[in-house]
Amino acid sequence: MSLSEGRRSGALRSPKQSYTMAFNFNWALFDVLLKYLEPRQGEAILDLGCSRGFYVRAMEAYTDGVVGVDISEASLKGAVSQRVKYGDITNLEFGDASFDKAYSLHTVEHIPNLRQFFAETARVLKPGGLVIIVYPWEPFRGFQAIVAAIRQYKNPFMARRIHLHRLTPVGVARLTEGTSLAHVKSKLVLALGIQYLTVLCKEG
């Protein structure tokens, strides 16, 4: 299935939900993800923090080996793909070197223990495997969560409860120190909003 066919078919719909289910699908961001991830049929690809699995469902057109993991039971009850599984992405239940590639879209800013997240990501990736991390550009922590904070808590100052970290490529590089993940590139991307994209590769 091509991207244009997917759009025409209406395969992906984004109902209005609470914040935990609100980040459903962004075609522009998916285009960017495909460019850097370069998925191929048969590859085992892991979506880290997949929410309801809209990106998992879209990725199924490129490989039958995609799996999504999310810890939100509310999101999983409304999952749109059977490849979505419940789990903690800082304590994954997969064996070492289980995946060819991985990606995480607007999830890392919510994770309390990021060093453990990157260590687990490195563990389940095969040597030479890529991981794409997308996270918000913010002048201050919580900037891009203000609207969500108003919607969810009726209080813009609760944005810092939603975004636990203000991340930059330099910060991500520091968090991956001591793991087998090497920095490949980082850039700002415009895809219905400004965000960072970082590409990491497992050495070995």
What do the PLM-derived regions correspond to, one by one?
Residues 1-91, 95, 101-105, 118, ...:
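Conserved N-terminal segment of class I S-adenosyl-L-methionine
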Residues 44, 128-130:
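Short glycine-centered segments of the SAM/dcSAM-binding site in methyltransferase folds
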Residues 54, 58, 112-120, 130-204:
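S-adenosyl-L-methionine-dependent methyltransferase catalytic module, highlighting the catalytic core
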Residues 96-100, 113, 127:
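Active-site acidic short loop of glycosyltransferases
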Residues 106-110:
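Short catalytic micro-motifs in class I SAM-dependent methyltransferases
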